């Protein structure tokens, strides 16, 4: 990777410290509350083989609160032996449930990652359940070292990304994503697409709201259809099934069957099935 390919400062994620540094000389300094640059440092990536074990068993240190989040969302460092990585921690106690999505949104974050893995799509960073994290039970998701100035609306016409966007569009229909904003589509330094912020998923009613309507009427990718066919021919993995109640599992299979039978991306005749804000 050349120097031109590296992030510039505008692309770094910013975090706000949970507590100001304990320095008497800086007491009362307004700069303590300002966001600070964060430099990515990890020995395992968002979906390496060891990542899930590190997230499940590692020591969790809270680094700061992520700004602009509607729910309590924290940047943490997870260390397990010689391995370490930053992660996004969403504790249940920090949630602000919606009228149609009760508490436990973090479980849907985990379930979405498991569904992506089960279908072989690799769209969602490794996400696990942690009951012993600093602020209580919640999800830990491997942090993606993305180009944060990029989002769906800056990458939607890139030929090298469109195939992954098409798979994500189909995946969101199956997972019933009600909040696929443009900023929830990340591109990492290897130009790989990642889907984050997946807490509003798996409702029993059709709730899809997404910015990705570009492929309406076009065929769903064959690899996605084959994956759905396999999924419908066998029981759901136990760890995924345990995160959903029976009605949610049945609705998941119904949506998968509908996408498989239809074979094409649907239209939005209302023009209102989009999230807000768009990014």
Regions found by a protein language model. Name each.
Residues 46-64, 176, 261-272:
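Short loop/turn hinge sites at secondary-structure boundaries
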Residues 13, 29-40, 145-169, 261-279:
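Repeat-unit-sized solenoid/scaffold elements
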Residues 1, 36-39, 66, 231:
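Detector for methionine-enriched segments
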Residues 2, 39, 43, 51, ...:
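Residue-identity detector for threonine
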Residues 10-55:
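Juxta-kinase regulatory segment immediately upstream of eukaryotic protein kinase catalytic domains
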Residues 3-23, 27, 79, 102, ...:
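C-terminal catalytic region of ATP-dependent kinase domains
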Residues 21, 35-37, 46, 86, ...:
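Proline-rich intrinsically disordered, low-complexity coils
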Residues 53-155, 160-161, 165-178, 182-183, ...:
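Conserved ATP-binding subdomain of kinase catalytic cores across diverse folds
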């Amino acid at each position: 990777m050349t120097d031109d390919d590296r992030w510039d400062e505008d692309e770094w994620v910013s975090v706000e410290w949970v507590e100001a540094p304990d320095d008497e000389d800086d007491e009362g300094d307004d700069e303590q509350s300002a966001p600070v640059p964060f430099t990515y440092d990890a020995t395992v990536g968002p979906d390496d083989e060891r990542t899930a074990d590190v997230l499940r068993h590692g020591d969790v240190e809270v680094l700061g609160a992520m700004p602009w989040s509607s729910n309590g969302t924290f940047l943490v460092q997870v260390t397990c032996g010689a391995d370490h990585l930053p992660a996004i921690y969403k504790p249940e106690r920090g949630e602000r449930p919606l009228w149609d999505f009760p508490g436990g949104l973090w479980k849907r974050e985990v379930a979405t990652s498991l569904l992506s893995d089960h279908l072989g799509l690799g769209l969602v960073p490794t996400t696990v359940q942690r009951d012993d994290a600093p602020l209580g039970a919640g999800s830990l998701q491997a942090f993606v070292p993305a180009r944060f100035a990029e989002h769906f609306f800056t990458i939607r016409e890139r030929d090298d990304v469109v195939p992954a966007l098409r798979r994500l569009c189909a995946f969101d229909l199956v997972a019933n994503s009600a909040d696929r904003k443009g900023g929830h589509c990340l591109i990492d330094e290897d130009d790989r697409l990642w889907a984050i912020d997946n807490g509003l998923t798996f409702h029993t009613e059709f709730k899809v709201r997404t910015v990705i309507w570009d492929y309406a009427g076009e065929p769903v990718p064959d690899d996605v259809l084959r994956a759905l066919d396999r999924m419908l021919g066998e029981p759901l993995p136990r760890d995924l099934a345990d995160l959903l109640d029976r009605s949610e599992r049945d609705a998941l299979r119904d949506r998968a069957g509908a996408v498989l039978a239809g074979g094409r991306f649907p239209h939005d005749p209302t023009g209102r099935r989009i999230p807000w804000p768009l990014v």
